[in-house]
Amino acid sequence: MLKLSMNTESLPSLNDKTLGWLTFLHRKVSINDDWSEDGEPLDWWDKTSNPPVLNFARFDLSESSYALGLMADVTPAWREVYAFILKGLSERHLTFWAAYDWLTQIGPDPNRGKYPQEWIDLWIPDHLVGKYDTPGWVANGIEPWGLQKDPIGADGNLFFKGWLNLIQSLHVYTTGEDTWGSSFQVAGVDRSKFDWTQHRLVEHLSSQWTKNRMGPHCENTKIWPYCLSAAGLGLQLYDAIFQKNTHSVYPEWVEHTKDKYYGFDSSGALEWTPIYYDPLIDHIHAAGPSNGLTIAFYMMPQDPIFAEFLYRTAVKKLGWDNINKEIKMKPEPRFMALGLACAKEFGDTTVEMRLRAFAEEHFEPRWFGENNINFGYWFNLNEKWPRGQWAALAMMAEVGKSGAWSNLFRNPNLEKFNAPSLEGVDFPNILVEQAFNDPNSQTLHIKLKVANKSKENSPSKIFIKKIPDLSAVKVKRDGYLYDMWKATGKSSIEIDISYSDMKLEIYTGWSGAKKRGEFNKVIKKDNLTSIGAGIMQRPQSLKIINTSSCPCCSSIGN
């Protein structure tokens, strides 16, 4: 039999670590744990990292969603598992435990006078020690807002509604279906329930942002540029999918607040970056320039010029670009993982390679689970499961190429919804490394890998849907013509396969619609914010922290 040549090495594919992480996320959402008032999330959901600000299970939901969006762009012809996981993440984000802080932290923190000195130094304005709530305490019910039972409808709680929309938008990006356009219920205070749709949520969020030019707040009284930049990503992807224009609030907000939220010297060099802003007391809580790295990660698809400025300044301060300077572990890995993701995104090969080598040595990458099918980063914590939030961020550097994160939001692939797609894979027994339609050759390229060796060589089947012309279909397996398939409808076929590693080429006749999302237009510089532009009145109160333990910042003197 003549073997036909096939070169798929240049096509995008998922590496082993990514597939191992994907199987673990699939495992996490496949178990129906109880996130209601009467239950508790299973302990593999991370509600431990970075107290008092991020030690809530919903941040595991949001951080776990990012790499799935990237995976959907690597294998756009196979998305069923990403959709399943993102649906599970979205559903959990509507529950009591997702909104735990807003539903239980009522009024001022009764322990505000007992904070450890470390928290005081890190989080509290100097003139309000003992009289001010730490970040992480939402203070639902305080004036001027009063008790607001709805975690979405509230004036505050930006970090809840902003990340919820981002996860839901990523879910829709994998399915092409307006799932969250139908009414869903979100848990409220005292077991109340509130009906929302994603479209109403976005309208509410963008309206709040328009009315408050400094930005909606997270905890009552505290506005976080970090969280607002994540919320902006959700609006950006939502607009691209639904052809809306809600994201315009983000560049306007950056331009309006830049000279209040960031400190520049007379030469325009960055001196400090914001952690949070309290408009009631006009107080900026800030850190050194390297803190800007955490904002840059979320900002770069939205304002790449200023985001890269923040990134380059942080890298310079940290010495990561100096091959003669040793990279040292920060107090926790979140900052390092974000740095690695940013370095890859900006194509900073020197920093990427240095941080990647550092992660391999210090993040404790490990395979686990039955047949070692799962992968995660364990961070030498000696815990039962990989630390969810940190591991999810560390995985960002494993998926896609340089620029993939920005491309997901600025140039989303919407033509995939009308292209031939692979479905019915027995995941996780069979893993999909590659599923990509090449419009030039009009061929769907698939690469499968058997994960469950106990099923090896036993029969299975897969389905190819949305084929434009069944009469033109030809199938090759590992380079040879293959006839173990049949039509199952006007635009679909069923292929008999086995539990074994294989490459499939399916000629479908699909040449591509050659249409991308609304954001495929070139982002002009006059649509982006400039560095150090404009003058805004400085805050009445400013505290620049100097610490080695900030969960979103870096080390002393940076």
Named regions from a protein language model:
Residues 1-45, 49, 56-58, 65, ...:
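Terminal, non-catalytic domain-edge segments
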Residues 11, 15-26, 65, 79-97, ...:
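Hydrophobic core segments within long, regular secondary-structure runs in both alpha-
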Residues 60, 64, 150-164, 227, ...:
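Extended HEAT/HEAT-like alpha-solenoid repeat tracts in very large eukaryotic scaffold/adaptor proteins
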Residues 76-222, 229, 268-271:
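Extended ligand-binding groove/face enriched in aromatic
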Residues 92-103, 261-268, 322-323, 364-372:
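Boundary/linker segments of alpha-helical solenoid repeat arrays
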Residues 189-200, 211-334:
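Extended ligand-binding clefts on enzyme/binding-domain cores
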Residues 443-445, 542, 556-558:
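Short beta-strands within extracellular/lumenal beta-sheet-rich domains
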Residues 524-547:
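Predominantly extracellular/luminal regions of secreted and cell-surface proteins
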